[in-house]
Design a protein with these regions (language model features):
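Predominantly soluble domains enriched in secretory-pathway, periplasmic, or organellar proteins
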Residues: 2-6, 10, 23-194
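Sec-dependent N-terminal signal peptides
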Residues: 9-19
Length: 194
């Protein structure tokens, strides 16, 4: 039996065209069903709390007009704002420790991290991660990505800069446990395999 006709250019072209049409119809349906809603200026990262059935959004607001930022609690189905937590520092990166229901936000501009109780919205504490003063020669590392290890209540925070680092923070005491230095130039990504 010859299968040569199954590999003809005409059949390959038809299969490719058919695949593209099917794929584009799915993406059109997905785009039509996607819920979008304007929430605030400077939306940066989100954290999802299954226990609280909430989506938390870090917004830095306006760079020049607003001194701080706002963390919004959103209904994950409707994207309605159910709570707004005003912060004197601009929040950028976001994560949540599901075990303690503590939200963690990286304050990139201030080289700090803020811990917020997800149930009450109260600030539990703040830690400055790089206290060096910014000058022409010195560029303090900036917190970028945050990952929470719920099993150990440890927060890992990438510090972006010329000589990047990862800060390891005790989630209970909100104190620096250790720093993993020299993780590369401008290293931004962070993942936890526990």
């Amino acid at each position: 039996m010859h299968l040569r006709h199954l590999f003809s250019p005409r059949l390959r072209g038809s299969l490719l065209l058919g695949s593209l049409l099917v794929a584009s119809s799915f993406s059109t349906l997905a785009a039509e069903d996607m819920l979008r809603k304007a929430v605030g200026k400077g939306a940066y990262e989100m954290a999802w709390s299954q226990q609280e059935n909430a989506l938390w959004l870090a917004t830095s607001q306006s760079r020049k007009l607003d001194k701080g930022g706002v963390v919004y609690r959103l209904d994950p189905v409707t994207l309605e704002i159910t709570q707004a937590i005003h912060n004197d520092l601009k929040p950028f990166g976001a994560t949540i420790n599901a075990a303690t229901q503590t939200l963690w936000f990286g304050n990139t501009i201030n080289s700090a991290v803020t811990a917020i109780d997800a149930k009450t919205g109260d600030v539990k504490g703040r830690l400055v991660l790089d206290a060096r003063k910014r000058t022409e020669e010195v560029r303090p590392l900036q917190p970028r990505e945050l990952v929470a290890d719920a099993a150990t209540n440890t927060i890992y925070i990438s510090g972006v800069g010329k000589e990047s680092a990862i800060w390891v923070v005790d989630g209970e005491t909100i104190k620096l446990k250790t720093t993993i230095e020299n993780t590369g130039k401008m290293s931004t990504g962070l993942a936890l395999d526990s």
